[in-house]
Amino acid sequence: MRLLPVLFSVLIAGCASVPPPAPQPLTIEQILQKPLYQMTPQEAGRYINHMQTNEPDLRKRIAAIGRKNIGQPYVLNLLGEFPFQIHDELPMFSLTHSDCVVFSEHTYAMALSRNWEEFFWMLQRIRYKDGVIGVATRNHYTEQDWNINNRWLVTDISAQLAGANVASYPLTVDRSRFLRTRHHTEASFPVTKSDEAYVPKEHVKEVLAQLNDGDFVNVISTRNGEYWASHVGLVVTAPDGSRNFLNSAAPQVREETFDAFMARVAAREAQQAAEGKPVQQLAGFKFLRLNDNIVVPPALPQPRP
């Protein structure tokens, strides 16, 4: 029986023992040594604040933040609205992986923000029409949704750049059908049509020198007579002053010359043809200028479900 008090004391001592100390947060110098896609949200928030404080030029900040993600693994169709909406379980942000749209949106949102909380708000302001979160208000269509609803951020200058060499294509968008078939969501939208200008691939070299860090790139593809924006990314300036394409594509985020990108696409086209598959061909590019003196508009109130 004398063992009982001893055992009781041991149990009490175990319950009252001090937990091990939490690991010390990294210094900003240590955080700066990590690629962005390996940072925790807390570290990313401190990195965002550091960039806002130490790089006042928005264009240079966009280029630096985008390059901080070089090597980030690529995953297609990465984000959704979970847990705000439960039509799928895809999250509303991702630091570890990206696709082309996710990479561009996260880079812009981080460059425009001072901390993690503002980044998350800014990301939704960019991803959704008027910043109202929902699968029906997400900017699904690059030309008619993303480019238009983010006119406060970027302006399409494709026709201006191309001049007499400008090309265009008609685009018809049926959002109701898209939401019903792709997201099992019923929503009523009118069918919309537009005429989209772009720079043909044969004339891209002639306009590259007019582009700046942070400008938005839409890659225009064609197949079976239809044209659409199949890929997006950012313009960055190389050390020699030439313009490169910073983008997320399998297997990872990379910075490459536009010549290298077009060669990579041409190789894919040749492979598709050799395999007897319908060939998705590169037609050209749309270029959207990052606006000067950006004023971020407020988001509309989130409606009650």
Regions found by a protein language model. Give the residues of each.
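Sec-dependent signal peptide recognition
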Residues: 1-9
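C-terminal motif of bacterial Sec signal peptides marking the signal peptidase cleavage site
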Residues: 13-14
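Acidic/histidine-rich, surface-exposed loop or edge segments in extracytoplasmic proteins
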Residues: 30, 38-50, 76-90
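Solvent-exposed, acidic/flexible segments
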Residues: 37, 41, 55-63, 90-101, ...
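Glycine-rich, acidic and aromatic/proline-enriched surface loops and short helix-turn segments
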Residues: 64-74
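Acidic/His-rich structured neighborhood in mature extracellular/periplasmic domains
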Residues: 72-194, 212, 219, 241, ...
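Short alpha-helix capping/helix-loop boundary micro-motifs
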Residues: 195-207, 223
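Low-complexity, Gly/Ser/Thr/Pro-rich intrinsically disordered linker/tail segments
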Residues: 210-218, 222, 229-230, 234-305
